Amino acid sequence: MGNSKQIKRSLTGSILLKKQISQIFFKKLESIFGIALAEDTSDRLMDYLNKSIDYLLDHSVIEGLFSIEIEESKLKSTIESIESTLITDFSLTTDPCYVASTFILYFSKLPNLLLSKISSQLIHSVEISHEEYRINVIRSLLYSLPLQNRNILKMVLHFLKKFSLACNNNNNNNSENNNTIVEDIEVQSAYNRFTKAFMSTTPGNFEISCKAIRLMVMDIDEFDKLPQDIQYMVKDGESIVKAATFDRLVEKLFDLSYGFKDPDYNYTVFHTYDYYTTSVELLGKIVHYYRIACTLTTKLQMEVSITILSVAMFWMKIHHNHLMTDLQFLQKLKIFLDSVPQVPPTQVTYFTYFQTFFKPVIEPLKPLYERGNSFLGPNLTQSSGTSKKKNQLIEKMMINNNINNNNNINNNVNSNSNNNFNNNIDIDIYNIGSNIIAQQITIIDNEMLMAIPPSQFLHKSFSKESKSPQFHDMVSKFNEWARWTSSEILSKEKLVERVVTLSFFIDLAKSCVELGNYNAANAIVGGLNHSSISRLKLTWERLSTKVTQDYDRLLSLFDLSMNYKNYRDEIKSTKAKIIPYLGLFPKDLIAIEEGNDNFTNNNLINTEKFRLLYQTIKKIQSYQQPLFTFKTSEPIKQYLKNISNGLSEEKDFHSISHKLEPRQQQTQ
């Protein structure tokens, strides 16, 4: 046809090559066809792919190279020769169509097609009409592929680009012979066949799948040249973000490709973004992508816009109290709201929430964190002076905004107005019993744990009381439980009473463990293990065998060796609701903070570090639950909340201890 060279086709699979050389003994090597790609892709495979590409480019002008499909059954001898390494090149091949069909067959026989994991996402991304955003999404998807898949894909994309150019050049050279249709068919056939071999397609999405391949081919030179702006790692079989630029990080919050299976990703960014950016910059990016969404086709515009607004509202709700005091953030938000004069009906809910930032603070808010149970405590709220000043600034920013000053808002934040209990009420903890006392201790500890916002565990905020008041409240209570334990024992002058008291507190620690309150249990064990108590040999000797065994088990549980291994193993295996030992979280968080940089060597945001931080926050939040069903006894609870009033000073413990059991008496 035309000036194209006519090639006589062999119907018997006519790649003969060195197979015709008789008397050659060879050992068949490991197959490359139908074998899953591995990280250590074999040199044989890469050699085969490279030689196939070189050969096909040399024969790109051959009529029917890709438009003629050779049946798989006729390729058997070709594949056997390749597998047996009898074919070292294709110089003796009598039909290039066999090389082309075998090349495509290799990809279609992979257990998992080269683009199978991102096929649906690629198809969806093609529908994005904003060119820059679309190509960024596609590149991000390609980076999520395993390295071996990505490298092989790049080889083929480069081949398709060169093949298309060769066909076009040949078409221009032979335009007088009307070969345009032939060349167009060859290029289209190549795209069609590689699309089928690479992606999971259906008749309904095949055309758009081909378009996805074409877009990747058009971008391949730029993709190869640019530095990688997002990195992934595999967890539980799914690709999750390991590191990224700020732009790619924000794009992934919206996940417009519908294939990003990383349930903790948004939480990670929302809780840790201030390690590498500001609320103003994050809001700026969200607004930027919202404006892009407004330029998309009608089909995508509503869906994408709502996704972006949902992400924005989710982030703002988590940090509502903090953002309410960030005037730069409020200015940025106000500018955005003013730029959307007519809010679509489907977006009213989101914009109504955004407007709440410009209403005066009547009472400190207790916004719910995303897990639904962790509240900001009163110490994080503004002073009345700061609040008044802020409200005045906000009102100046308001334009025709109706402010509903509702003075009837019910405020239940740590109110003690109904507390008529006398702090000096006479409570006999020994008659009440260790189990009931343990319950009331647990109620107190649980309330204190729930009051700690996640922000107090980040940026080492826990190291400064001014930055973590609720955290330090619970630490102080932990120390108070320990001091109370030691003080109560030392307050008993009679040996018999000391033995009873010592037994009681061992039983109290045991009861706390049984209730899941490991924090108080560890505090009590610390009080029992205070050197002023541990030296009371006469007292310890009088303990019953059972009580001594209980104490030994408690010591083993809270043994410091191997980073609290026994304790960690126990809480890992328990399915019960617990109050964990608070002191380990700072230790774990400091290890993450100091052991990982915020940015990688190539200046990407180290998402892996922040994921580790959030995993600890997530664990803490899982404990911040209204866990316990037993009833509160206000007299006992109030007594326990105020036990520090009558305790001995720790500096006096040793002198009291020596008075109770002098060294001479212990040695007699």
UniProtKB/Swiss-Prot annotation:
It comes from Dictyostelium discoideum. The record marks S67 as: Arginine finger. Keywords: GTPase activation, Guanine-nucleotide releasing factor. Residues 433-663 form the Ras-GEF domain. This is Ras guanine nucleotide exchange factor D. The keyword Repeat does not apply. The lineage of its organism: Eukaryota, Amoebozoa, Evosea, Eumycetozoa, Dictyostelia. SUPFAM superfamilies: GTPase activation domain, GAP (SSF48350), Ras GEF (SSF48366). Promotes the exchange of Ras-bound GDP by GTP. One of its GO terms (cellular component) is plasma membrane. Residues 27-224 form the Rho-GAP domain. PANTHER family: GUANINE NUCLEOTIDE EXCHANGE FACTOR, RAS GUANINE NUCLEOTIDE EXCHANGE FACTOR D. Transmembrane segments: none annotated. Pfam families: RasGEF (PF00617), RasGEF_N (PF00618), RhoGAP (PF00620). One of its GO terms (biological process) is response to differentiation-inducing factor 1. InterPro entries: Ras-like_GEF, Ras-like_Gua-exchang_fac_N, Ras_GEF_dom_sf, RASGEF_cat_dom, RASGEF_cat_dom_sf, Rho_GTPase_activation_prot, RhoGAP_dom. Residues 237-362 form the N-terminal Ras-GEF domain. It comes from the Eukaryota.
